Amino acid sequence: MSHFFADHDAPLSMLSVKTEYFPQLTDKEQKYAHFMSKASHAGSRVVMRQVSHESEPIFDLILAIHSKLNGKYPEDDITQKQQTGLYLEYVSQFLSNLGNFKSFGDTKFIPRCEVKFFKQLLELAKINPCSSPLTLSPVDVNHEFTSHHLFSTINELIDIGIYHVEEKAALLGFPSQGYTSAYYLGLPVTPEDMALLKEQLFAELAILPENTRINKVGENSFQIWVASENVKNQITETYPSGQITLSNAVTKVEFIFGDHSREMRLVASYLKEAQKFAANDTQKAMLQEYINHFVTGSSQAHKEAQKLWVKDISPVIETNIGFIETYREPSGIIGEFESLVAIQNKERTAKFSSLVNNAEEFISLLPWSKDYEKPIFNPPDFTSLEVLTFTGSGIPAGINIPNYDDVRLKIGFKNVSLGNILSAAAKSSSKHPPSFISQEDRPIFEKYQSDSFEVQVGIHELLGHGSGKLLTEFTDGFNFDKENPPLGLDGKPVSTYYKVGETWGSKFGQLAGPFEECRAEVIAMFLLTNKKILDIFGFHDVESQDKVIYAGYLQMARAGLLALEYWNPKTGKWGQPHMQARFSIMKTFMKHSTDKNFLKLEMNSTNDDFAIKLDKSLIKTAGHECVKDYLKHLHVYKCSGDVEQGSKYFIDRSTVTPDLASLRDIVLSKRLPRRQFIQSNSYIDDNNKVTLKEYDETPQGMLQSFLDREL
C-alpha cells in the first residue's frame, strides 16, 4: 500500500525564463508566446479527463478548497502542520501530473494525509461533503462528456476517487482486464474491440484516431467521441453521419462530435489571437489548420498543420499543440493532449545544428545496410529550447515529432531539446544524493551526468528517432525492391513489410512505444563513444570525453535498475515505456555482454543496498559490442515490420528475471521523489505589454499558478 503514497519532499523547480530569455523577445514575439501559452493551458482539463475519470473533479475540489481557505491551511499544532504538509504534497504532485496517476510510471498515487484530515478541510472551507462534485465545476462545461457525475457526492469522490486503490485498477490499461483507462467509457473496452476499430473503422475510412475517445454502449455498439468545438458533424465528406455498420456486418459505430467542446473553443480562440502576431505566412497557415482541427475535429487538418510546422524552420518561439503521444492509451493509437511553447536558446542550438550537419556521416556508422535507411536524409530542424509552457501529464527532455509516418518520410520532422528541463532533471538534490552510485564514482557522475545526458538526448532525438526506413507498400508501389528485399538478421531476404495503410503504431500496437524508445536509447549508447560527436558538444580532450562516456553508461545502468519501480511483479506489466527500454539495456549490459565483468552489482554487508560496478575499460569493447548486437536486432525488426519476431525478441529482453526481480524491494526503498515543475503565467498589462508572473518553489506556489490560470 505504501508504494501508492504521493512523493514526500519532492524537489520543485520554477521554469524560469523571465530574466534571461523572455526580455530578449520583441513585443510581437512576446504576444505570440502569450497567446500560444494561453491556448496551451486551455487544454489542461482535457489531459485530466484522459488520465482518469476522477482527475477533473479532484482538480475542481482541491482548487475550491484552496480558494475558500484563502491558502490558509490549519497549522495550530504539530499534527495539523504535518497533515497539512502531506496534503499539499499530494496536491502539488497531482497538479504537476495533471491527474492522480504518475505521468512517469502510470500508477495511481494517493495522499499521505489521513482521510479524516482531508474531510476536515471540507468543513473549514464550508464545502458540503454530501453535495455533488458537479457543484464545483465551471458552469459552461458540458458534463455529458465529463466524469463528475460518476461520483454522487464529494465524500464518494474522496473515498473512492482519491483514496481507494486496487493493485490492478491502480495501473493504466484495458478496463476489460481490470486496469484503468479514461480513454474509454461505458462498458469495459477489450483489446479485441480496439483491434476491430483500428482495422475496420479508422484504417478503412482513413480517419486518424488521435483526437478521440471510445464509448462502448453495447456489446457490438460504439460511439467515437471526437474532440471539437462543433457539437455537430460539419465534416461529413470525411466522417460519416449517423450510425454505420462495420465490414464484419455486426458492429455498429457512430461518430459523436463536441468532446471537450469548451476547451476546444478556448484553444481555437487563443490561436486566432496568436495568428495576429505570427512571424511569417507559414506560421499563420499552420495556425489556421490547427484552428480548423480544434473547431471541426478533422484529424487531417492536424496533419496539415504538422506539415507546415516542419517547414517553419528554427522559429524564435517554437510551439506545437494537439493530441500527440499515444503511449498511455492501451491500444497505442489515441493521443494525449499536449502543447509546448518555448524560446530558442541560440547558444545551445549551435551545438545541435553541428550535429545535424554531420548526421548523414553518423547514421552511416550504424550497424545495418543502406537498404534500411532513407535514400536521402533531409536534415531536420534541431533547436534547444527554454520552456515557457508545457501542457501535458509530464514534460520530456527532448521531442521528435510529428509522429505521422508519411509526413516524416515525405516532408521531415523536427527535433527539440528542452534545455531548462534537461538541466533541472540532471540536477542532484542535496537532500537526495544519487542512489546506487559508489562513493568512488560519485564525483564523476555528479560532474558529468548533466553533460552526458545532453549528448544522449541529442543523439536519441536526431539520430535515434530520425534514422531508419520502414519497408512499405504504397498504393502506387513499394519504397524498396520487392523482388530483391534487404537481407534480414539470418542473412536471407526479409519476407515481412508494412502493407498499404499499416503504420509502425498500428502494427506493433502497445509495444511500439517502448520498442522505439529502446531503439533510440541504444543508438545513443552506440554513438556516445564517437569522439567527433563529443567534440561537437565541447569535449575536446580524451580525459573529459572518457568521463562523459563513462557517466553516460553509468547513468543508463542506474536508470535500468531504477526501472524496476515501474514494473509490476504481480502482473508482469511495465508502467512506463522509457523505463522498460532502459531496463532491457541494463540487462543487455549485464547478461548479454561477452565479458560478464562489464556490469556487476556489489551488495552491502546488510543486503539492503548495492552499488553499480561498471568496468570502464570494457565500454569500447565488450560493452559496445553487446549494444551493437541489440541495436541491429531492434532496427531490422522495426524496419521490416516483423511484428512476430520483433515482439518476441523485445519482450524477452525486457522480461525481469528472478535475480533482478529480487532487487525491486531495495530499489523501492531507495526511491527518490520525482522533480515537479511550476510554470509561469503571462498577462497583457495596462500598457499593452506582456508580463510574466512566476511563483515560489513550494506546493502553494504550484497551487497559485493553477488558480491564476482560471481553467
Swiss-Prot record:
* Top EC class for this record: hydrolase
Instruction: Note how many cofactor molecules are bound and how.
Output: Binds 1 zinc ion per subunit.
Asked if Transmembrane helix is a keyword of the record, the answer is no
Q: Which Pfam families match?
A: Peptidase_M49
Q: Which GO terms describe its cellular component?
A: cytoplasm; nucleus
Q: Name one GO molecular function term.
A: metalloexopeptidase activity
Instruction: Answer yes or no on keyword Membrane.
Output: no
Q: So where's the catalytic machinery, residue-wise? A: E461
Q: Which residues does the record give as Zn(2+) binding sites?
A: H460, H465, E517
Cofactor list? Zn(2+)
So what family is this one in? Belongs to the peptidase M49 family.
Q: Know the name of this protein?
A: Probable dipeptidyl peptidase 3
Organism of this sequence: Saccharomyces cerevisiae (strain ATCC 204508 / S288c) (Baker's yeast)
